[in-house]
Amino acid sequence: MRTIFVGVLLLAIMGEGRLCALEWPVDKPKFLSLFGQSVGAGLLQQGLIFDGADSAGERGYAVRTAGYGRCVMRLQKHRRARVFPGALGNALIFAHEDGLQTVYANLREAKNAQDFGSTAEAESGVTVGYAGSSAWAPPNSFVFPGD
């Protein structure tokens, strides 16, 4: 009975939605903070923070798209000085065909959507920037938020 239930459950899951996978946005993932990790005062981390420093500890690693998608928004740290600065710093947001969205934050400099061509689309693995110090995160790190 248990085997039949598991088989029916698997068929329902497979028929209900598509499976999706993303690539790591950096070559050698080294985490400073994990999703769901306690950050004190009962708060939990809402994303991954990668150590983005190179072997010399200076320049940040290249950050790449985790999957094929379209750049839908670019956030700049110094774009609007009259409003409260965002915690993401320089960031890009990509929408993917499967309904997922990926956010690449704390970049040294974020590319323009036009840098990806007239359709603002990018294949998986395209460099979108370099780990930086533009957000509320450690220097030379890269923030990959998730909710």
UniProtKB/Swiss-Prot annotation:
Signal peptide: 1-21
Record keyword Signal present: yes
Signal found in the keyword field: yes
Top-level taxonomic group: Bacteria
Keywords: Signal
Entry-linked InterPro entries: Dup_hybrid_motif
Protein name: Uncharacterized protein TP_0782
Species for this entry: Treponema pallidum (strain Nichols)
